[in-house]
Design a protein with these regions (language model features):
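Short amphipathic alpha-helical interaction patches enriched in hydrophobic/aromatic residues
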Residues: 17-21, 43, 62-67, 86, ...
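An active-site-proximal "capping" alpha-helix that borders the catalytic cofactor pocket
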Residues: 35, 73-88
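Short coil-to-beta-strand
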Residues: 4-9, 48-56
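Divalent metal-dependent phosphate-bond-processing catalytic cores, especially two-metal-ion Mg2+/Mn2+ enzymes
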Residues: 2-4, 21-47, 59, 110-187
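Short alpha-helical hairpin
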Residues: 1-18
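His-Asp-centered metal-binding catalytic motifs of divalent-metal-dependent phosphohydrolases/nucleases
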Residues: 50-68, 74-78, 98-107
Length: 187
């Protein structure tokens, strides 16, 4: 496990999340941190390459927190940024390609086939991470979007339902209790 790279990425992502290009607020770092945590958990559960999943999880949204103008295609730009960073850190070229594919295919809103278990782990970790960051979603709804209490609650509830529905069948089964427990807040 390249702990040196993982530690570097934690700092790099934190710094970028504090920069002027990040228009998603402080919750962006916590989202990425939760993706890395869930990615590691899923990689262990499903037998994926943990190192690739963890590194890809830390890098999956790097483009969108670096420059808001890259957001729409952040999965493509992020793969390029990841390659640049990981090459400088002398990471294995074959693993760089796996990381890039995980980043390119992580978005649930962009229908792309997940060809490897690592890609599925990162995509599922991204979707389920919203359940670890409900306060950030509420902040987004109420503070950043200026929604009423009812509108904000519906926004967050629907976001969580969409996120859960993006999961692979294996991850849905694995996270059923987390989903049900979180949904109790909205009854």
């Amino acid at each position: 496990m390249r702990e040196d790279i993982i530690e570097y990425l934690k700092k790099e992502i934190y710094e970028r999340s504090q920069g002027p290009g990040n228009k998603f607020g402080e919750g962006a770092y916590y989202h990425i941190e939760a993706v890395a945590k869930n990615g590691e958990l899923l990689a262990k559960k499903f037998g994926a390459d943990e190192e690739v999943v963890i590194i890809a999880s830390w890098l999956h949204d790097i483009a969108s927190i670096t420059d808001i103008d890259l957001y729409e295609m952040h999965h493509i730009h992020g793969a390029s940024i990841a390659e640049e960073i990981l090459t400088k850190l002398n990471y294995d070229k074959d693993k760089i390609n796996l990381v890039k594919e995980c980043i390119k295919n992580h978005r649930g809103s962009v229908k792309m086939d997940k060809l490897t278990i690592e890609e599925q782990c990162v995509a599922d970790a991204d979707a389920i991470s919203h359940f670890d960051n409900v306060p950030s979603l509420l902040y987004l709804a109420y503070k950043q979007k200026g929604m009423s209490i009812e509108e904000g609650a519906d926004f967050v509830k629907n976001k969580l339902i969409r996120s859960y529905n993006k999961l692979s069948d294996n991850s849905k089964e694995f996270y059923t209790d987390k989903f049900n427990d979180t949904m109790k807040m909205f009854k």
